[in-house]
Regions:
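Active-site pocket-lining/capping segments in soluble small-molecule metabolic enzymes
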Residues: 1-194
Length: 194
């Protein structure tokens, strides 16, 4: 579940299913994790992307997943990028939806004043955008540390990678073959949030 309302809906509709809380659900401290445990009894939760190594180390690893690769969402915006550019596709999107075709895709990039490009996931169904970091998160240097902690699972979140890139990353993280991503960030893992 990526939002609390989803957790309630899944629990109501599919009470026999196990829940897994995504990193977008606030689980930054033990009190909130306990609250979610009492309300939804999730099988696992994904460590918040804001956690640093000390914070990750203080949480119980048995039911914790951790994103170790993937572009991190930096902002969700209701100001549609396509509409701002005069390229709104709502009529086309309505036709897609009626045919069962997904109405969201990486369709543009934003460039900042340093010429760094950020991919934008445009969701035409809800007129929203998710702007992702220009480089992927990669915690490959800390995998052994997380394994020693006994973390339940690691997650690789693919967004705009090609099939070939997906295969390279999977091989690198699962078998240690190949090379680390050329450009990456460790996010808040080393420094935490201020």
């Amino acid at each position: 579940c990526g939002q609390l309302v989803e957790c309630g809906w899944v629990q109501e509709k599919y009470p026999e299913k196990k829940l897994s809380l995504q990193h977008s659900v606030y689980t930054f401290n033990r009190e909130t994790r306990q609250l979610y445990q009492d309300c939804f009894a999730p099988d696992s939760y994904t460590a918040p992307l804001e956690l640093n190594r000390e914070g990750a180390g203080s949480a119980s690893p048995q039911n914790q997943e951790m994103v170790v690769y993937g572009r991190v969402p930096m902002m969700v915006s209701a100001g549609c990028v396509k509409r701002s550019l005069g390229a709104c596709q709502i009529p086309h999107t309505q036709k897609q939806l009626s045919q069962g075709i997904p109405a969201a895709a990486f369709s543009c990039w934003l460039k900042d004043r340093y010429n760094v490009e950020f991919p934008v996931w445009v969701n035409c169904r809800h007129c929203t955008n998710t702007i992702y970091n220009s480089v992927p998160l990669s915690l490959h240097q800390y995998l052994a540390e997380q394994k020693r902690r006994g973390i339940r699972a690691i997650r690789l979140d693919f967004t705009d990678e090609t099939a070939e890139k997906n295969a390279e990353v999977l091989e690198f993280f699962s078998e240690g073959k190949g090379t680390a991503p050329a450009q990456y960030t460790t996010g808040h893992y080393k420094k935490g949030v201020q």
